[in-house]
Amino acid sequence: MKISLSLQQDFRSPELELKRAQLKKIIETTLRHVGYKEDCEIGIACVDLEESHQLNLQYREKDKPTNVLSFPSDIPEEVLPMLDALPLGDLVICIPVVLQEALEQKKTAQNHFAHLLVHGVLHLLGYDHETSDEDAEEMEGLEIEILAKLNIANPYQE
């Protein structure tokens, strides 16, 4: 499986260093865990509070910034055979929210970012935690298993 990663860092923080190789490892671990084997493309944009707030309001009608937004690709079926790699979609991650949540939850910024990246990739693959309790449990279970493979503790454990 080949992963093409587009990383746009509109907001950077010395508290959270993002390395392309590490991001690809997290994405690949997530994809392999759920049985995904195709070459793919994923975009990640790291943004500030204002942009996250605006996008969250525009696309989810929630009037506040959020940690991660997922925008699955909407490629017509007839176009897919013409592509070398499947565009899975884009993730927008708000770095200030990640840093604040990590602090509040007593986690490292790196580990919390990894969790949100796993969470976002699962959304790009069609997983959803807002449709039912069963779906939420399934998604959380997958996140815990994937993060364990990356030597990251269960993010839902107090």
Curated annotation (Swiss-Prot):
It is found in: Cytoplasm. Its cofactor is Zn(2+). It comes from the Bacteria. The keyword rRNA processing applies. Zn(2+) binds at H119, H123, H129. Belongs to the endoribonuclease YbeY family. This is Endoribonuclease YbeY. It comes from Acinetobacter baumannii (strain AYE).
